[in-house]
Design a protein with these regions (language model features):
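Signature aromatic-anchored transmembrane alpha helix within multi-pass, membrane-resident enzymes
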Residues: 496, 511, 543-615
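Flexible, charged surface loops at secondary-structure boundaries
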Residues: 421-425, 651-656, 688-694
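Phosphate- and divalent-cation-binding pockets in alpha/beta enzyme and binding domains
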Residues: 152, 485, 670-674, 707
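A short, well-structured beta->alpha microelement
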Residues: 365, 675-691
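Periplasmic/luminal catalytic loop of GT-C fold multi-pass membrane glycosyltransferases
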Residues: 433, 689-784
Length: 805
């Protein structure tokens, strides 16, 4: 595949050394370099771009295959890698420590249960192709459970755990969350590959902030699809950035894989497409405008001319956003109208039939496209083997593009088209395998994979699950992410004042996600990570100058009081030498003082941030009333109930899981997963099994547990009396911050007085600050703590003495 890469192989040290020198010509300088305006170009980078074109024009048959030779890492590489490996290890420990301690959330139990079903399906996969035996069900993609990615890979974790001899035959609360913790750790590692854009210190800071972020840690210990999507989104960012920088095909393939996996994870990928696609359009508009001079068209002696931009680039971007803004307005209005239409009971059948026709057309066309694409790639591989690959050359529109000032257009117009085909093939294979459930449901998987997710997402805009106000994330994120919020704002300011394309992209990504997720009907705490992730990278950009200045000062101070040999050794072969050059001009005392104050402020803000992370991830992970981020969570009472069920089964059947259990419909989740080893469970009890009598155990849930008590525990016509035990299945955070129209009192009064403000009370800043402070350090709830969903355990009287009360 060498001839497709279009770049010679570089070792990591060489790549690090070369990349910072020509960053602005690609997407902007590293953060340690002196920033310039986005219209300026670096003339001495022409040789780098020209070398790229020389590689493009080489004949494939003239290339000499190069073999990678193993060589031990250099001191410079070690000094670069060790700090990153240290913070990645920190992130892994925070994510894997006590991973299975918390009971499974309602949604986690669904994901765990159907992943286990998929694992069992793979043992009899032919039954899922042909009509299965009566009573045998196969997992198929349904957007109600979101994308198929997590079910395939959690099932894979189950299988690996079984092979390794993990407890409970490899299926337990820990193995359910291993995938989330693994990809959450991967998020911590990914900024390492953005060193050319963030600088080494900036990249390390991004890794560290992601490692200790309360939201990133908590939801990396939570088997929901959002942490997977966040990983794949950041993987796309890394892949695109690295591809524009190196032109190596593997990075474009990684980008395509990241997109395909994200699409196979959650429908919110549509929002990612909106943000990334609109920024791509703005960047293309900017680069198109760069070729048209503006200032030079006017009289240079006029004082007004000096205020004009050099080119039409700002004008084209303004025009682009004006058009895009109007288009977005109509798009959102269309989405709303379509959502209302398809959820109207009078239109449901017509909407379903229309979507089914779209699926049928897609199923007829997409496989043919996939086969043709695969055949084309096979031809390319054959020609590669024969040494007859045609390498892309600069021709046509590419001749009119300035590689330095228009790197994106240059990338698009001069890249080998083989890169696109391999990337598309990679995405197509991932889509087909996951949505067809490993080729067991090809027709349904293709049609549903293309249309059903979008259809479901449009329907959910009217459901508005959670009914949260527009300011939900503006309350939630500052409560937990103190260092991220403060330095994220500083990062935005720095990115605007000292812009590079990558910095502006991060700002656009953060602001775009904040707006879109606040606009979307469904607002949940797990969605906050799509906002906090770019915010934390911006926080690294905001904090980096102060850290660099302080490290520089300490190194220079050490060198002043060291021998010349020690001072030379301090700077020689330094993995961060490019960010702390020996010839760097002295920084003024005032600037140094400001930098030290900035670092001190960062440490002070880090304290509540880390404290919040510790509290939500390890102290109150199953305590909804005391953690806004937890929102609603299964309580540890579920473990208590299961311990009693297991004890009864041990008493009656020697632990063979043969006991009959009645499970009412309101208690199905999470108990469908917790009772997975009990084959004699009657779901939707008692209507689900009218012939069952004298059931040893009944588990019920609902808003009226006392009605269940009357039915099974105290009814005079019930000869088989049951012992009644009341527990809490789920608890939740108080929602008094909602506006009065949706049952709250508003955020100001709620923060000031809780749920019961005095008559004619107004927002009180002092009381609000006091309540937030008490919540930060004592976890004293702001509102009511009694919100709960009850459950009832009934044990037949003749067995009640077999277990402890």
């Amino acid at each position: 595949m060498k001839s497709f890469e279009t770049e010679p192989i570089e070792d990591a040290a060489a790549a690090d050394s070369a990349s910072n020198k020509h960053e602005l010509g690609r997407l902007g300088p590293s953060s340690s370099e002196k920033s310039t305006t986005i219209e300026e170009e670096i003339s001495d980078e022409r040789d780098v771009v020209d070398s790229d074109l020389v590689v493009y024009e080489e004949k494939a048959e003239d290339e000499v295959p190069q073999r990678r030779r193993f060589s031990p890492p250099t001191r410079e590489q070690l000094l670069t890698w060790i700090p990153f490996w240290g913070v990645i290890l920190l992130g892994a420990v925070l994510r894997f420590w006590g991973l299975g301690d918390k009971p499974l959330h309602h949604d986690e139990s669904l994901h765990a249960y159907y992943s286990l079903q998929l694992l069992n399906n793979m043992a009899h996969w032919t039954w899922c192709i042909n009509p299965p035996p009566q009573g045998y069900s196969c997992y198929i993609y349904t957007p109600l459970l979101h994308g198929p990615f997590q079910f395939h890979f959690i099932a894979l974790v189950y299988k690996i755990s079984q092979l390794l001899g993990a407890p409970d035959n490899g299926v337990n609360t820990t193995t359910v969350r291993i995938l989330a913790a693994t990809l959450g750790t991967g998020i911590v590692a990914l900024p390492f590959f953005l060193r050319d854009y963030l600088g080494k210190v900036g990249a390390w800071l991004a890794c560290f902030l992601l490692a200790v972020s309360p939201s990133m840690v908590y939801f990396s210990r939570f088997a929901r699809e959002d942490i997977y999507m966040a990983f794949f989104t950041l993987l796309m960012v890394v892949g695109i950035a690295r591809y524009v920088h190196t032109r190596k095909m593997r990075w474009l393939v990684i980008t395509a894989a990241g997109f395909a996996f994200s699409y196979a994870t959650k429908e919110a990928t549509f929002l990612t497409i909106m943000v990334f696609g609109s920024f791509l359009g703005a960047l293309i508009a900017w680069e198109l405008g760069l070729k048209a001079p503006l200032r030079s068209r006017f009289n240079q002696e006029s004082p007004v001319v000096a205020w004009l931009p050099k080119s039409f680039a700002p004008v084209t971007v303004l025009v682009y956003f004006a058009i895009a803004g109007v288009a977005a307005k109509y798009l959102f209005a269309w989405i709303k109208s379509v959502s209302i239409y398809i959820t109207d009971p009078n239109n449901v059948n017509a909407a379903n039939n229309y979507v089914q026709r779209l699926k049928d057309i897609t199923v007829a066309i997409v496989p043919v496209i996939g086969i043709l694409l695969g055949a084309f790639v096979l031809v390319l591989l054959y020609r590669e083997i024969r040494g007859k690959v045609v390498v892309a050359k600069r021709r046509g529109l590419a001749n009119k593009v300035d590689p330095e000032r228009q790197p994106l257009l240059d990338t698009i117009l001069t890249m080998p088209w083989t890169h696109w085909f391999f990337a598309l093939l990679c995405a197509w294979v991932i889509f087909l395998l996951l949505f067809s459930v490993m080729l067991t449901n090809i027709r349904g998987g293709i049609g549903d994979g293309v249309w059903q997710g979008l259809y479901y997402w449009l329907q959910q805009q009217q459901v508005a699950r959670g009914s949260q106000p527009w300011y939900y994330y503006l309350m939630l994120i500052p409560l937990y992410e103190q260092i991220g919020v403060v330095f994220g704002l500083l990062g935005i300011i720095r990115s605007v004042v000292q812009p590079t394309r990558f910095r502006l992209f991060l700002v656009y990504w953060f602001v775009g996600n904040l707006i879109l997720y606040s606009w979307a009907a469904e607002k949940m705490p797990w969605l906050m990570i799509h906002i906090t992730m770019p915010m934390l990278i911006l926080a690294a950009i905001g904090l980096e100058p102060a850290v660099v200045t302080c490290i520089n000062f300490m190194k220079n101070l050490f060198a002043r009081f060291s021998s010349p040999k020690e001072a030379e050794a301090l700077h020689a072969n330094d993995g961060y030498a490019q960010e702390f050059p020996k010839a760097r001009p002295k920084v003024g005392i005032f600037a140094t003082s400001i930098s030290f104050l900035g670092v001190i402020m960062a440490v002070l803000l880090l304290l509540p941030t880390v404290h919040n992370m510790y509290e939500v991830a390890y102290v109150h992970p199953a305590d909804g009333p005391h953690e806004m981020m937890v929102y609603v969570q299964t309580t540890t009472d579920v473990n208590t109930v299961m311990a009693k069920v297991d004890a009864l089964d041990q008493k009656m059947f020697g632990g063979k899981h043969q006991m009959q259990i009645g499970l009412t419909g309101d208690a199905t989740w999470p108990y469908a997963w917790y009772l997975r080893d009990y084959p004699n469970v009657c779901f939707d009890f008692p209507t689900g099994c009218p012939g069952w009598k004298n059931v040893p155990v009944i588990i019920g849930g609902g808003d009226n547990p006392y009605g269940l008590e009357q039915q099974y525990g105290g009814a005079t016509n019930n000869p088989d009396k049951y012992t009644y035990q009341l527990y809490k299945m789920r608890t939740w955070w108080d929602e008094g911050y909602k506006p009065p129209a949706t049952g709250g009192i508003g955020p100001g009064l709620w923060l000031s007085y809780g749920d019961n403000p005095p008559l004619n009370a107004k927002f009180n800043l002092g009381l609000a600050a006091q309540h937030i402070w008490q919540w930060w350090w004592q976890r004293r709830a702001i509102g009511d703590t009694g919100g709960a969903y009850d459950m009832v355990l009934f044990i037949r009287n003749d067995l009640s003495t077999a277990v402890k009360p």
